[in-house]
């Protein structure tokens, strides 16, 4: 190999010397038309001896130079192979970090042993997490604390009821709040309906009206007992009222009767009858007013009014 390279080197040197000689001839050539003629035309001329050799040798020199370069590369590769094969080490990228380097250096058996404890550790961590979640779910449905349960049990025993009857009792209490306002809600008497056990004896308004006329009769009797005193005092004097609560309208009929008895009996009876009717009407009006005031809603009803 070395001898072949030494032989080819003088050939290349000879080619380079011929090329330089041609360049020098071209520079020495005077400015004539013969110098401007291309190389292939000069070769076709009858004077073939004058044909420049440099142009014809250029492609051969180029081919030889390419062959020499290829052979030099092949020789370098062969020399590298003769020196010895390079150790094939596993190329590790720096992005993977030191852990991957250590894994590459370790044999596969050790790697499998390492992977097994890691997998078991991950499984144990997952099972512990699931256990904690299950505990949280159980604690989420918070049962009734024992203190509250024990407090509700004695309450049921003191009432003499079974434990399941407590909601019914509470509902009954909520329903019994309504009859407290039965005397206020007069616009809708349908809402005041009660059960048979909760009803209380109510006094009918007709019975009250029937009792009302008796009160003026008692007052009239009291006034009649005082009539002789009024006669002694005289007709012009006013009769003192024994009871301040008694209205003055009740004092008029006896006086009118006495006045009417003096002139004549018939006229006095007519006047007294008309006055009694007027007095009864006025008393009835007063009674109606009192009843209307008593029946008025003192407090606005809390229950909704459906009209």
Swiss-Prot record:
Region (Disordered): 42-153
Basic residues: compositionally biased ranges: 129-139
Listed PANTHER family: CHROMOSOME 16 OPEN READING FRAME 86
Provenance organism: Mus musculus
Lineage, highest ranks first: Eukaryota, Metazoa, Chordata, Craniata, Vertebrata
Sequence ranges of Basic and acidic residues compositional bias: 42-52, 112-121
Protein name, UniProt field: Uncharacterized protein C16orf86 homolog
InterPro entries linked: DUF4691 (IPR031516)
Pfam families for the chain: DUF4691 (PF15762)
């Amino acid at each position: 190999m070395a001898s072949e390279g030494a032989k080819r080197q003088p050939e290349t040197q000879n080619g380079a010397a011929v090329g330089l000689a041609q360049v020098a001839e071209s520079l020495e050539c005077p400015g004539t038309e013969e110098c401007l003629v291309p190389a292939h035309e000069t070769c076709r001329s009858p004077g073939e001896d004058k044909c420049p050799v440099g142009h014809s040798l250029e492609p051969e020199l180029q081919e030889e130079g390419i062959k020499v370069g290829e052979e030099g590369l092949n020789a370098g590769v062969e020399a590298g192979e003769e020196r010895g094969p390079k150790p094939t080490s596993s190329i590790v990228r720096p992005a993977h970090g030191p852990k991957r380097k250590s894994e590459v250096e370790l044999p596969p058996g050790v790697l499998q042993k390492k992977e097994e404890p890691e997998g078991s550790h991950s499984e144990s961590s997952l099972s512990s997490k699931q256990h904690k979640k299950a505990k949280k779910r159980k604690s989420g449905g918070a049962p009734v604390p024992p203190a509250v349960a024990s407090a509700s049990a004695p309450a049921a025993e003191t009432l003499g009821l079974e434990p399941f009857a407590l909601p019914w009792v509470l509902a009954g209490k909520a329903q019994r709040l309504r009859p407290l306002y039965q005397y206020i809600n007069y616009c809708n008497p349908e809402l005041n309906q009660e059960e048979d056990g909760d009803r209380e004896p109510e006094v009918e308004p007709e019975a009250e009206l029937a009792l009302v006329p008796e009160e003026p009769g008692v007052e009239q009797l009291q006034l009649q007992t005082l009539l002789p005193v009024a006669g002694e005092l005289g007709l012009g004097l006013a009769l003192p009222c024994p009871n301040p609560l008694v209205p003055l309208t009740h004092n008029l009929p006896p006086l009118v009767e006495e006045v009417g008895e003096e002139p004549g009996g018939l006229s006095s009876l007519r006047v007294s009858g008309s006055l009694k009717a007027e007095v009864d009407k006025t008393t009835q009006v007063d009674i109606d007013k009192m009843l209307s005031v008593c029946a008025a809603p003192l407090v606005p009803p809390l229950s909704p009014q459906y009209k």
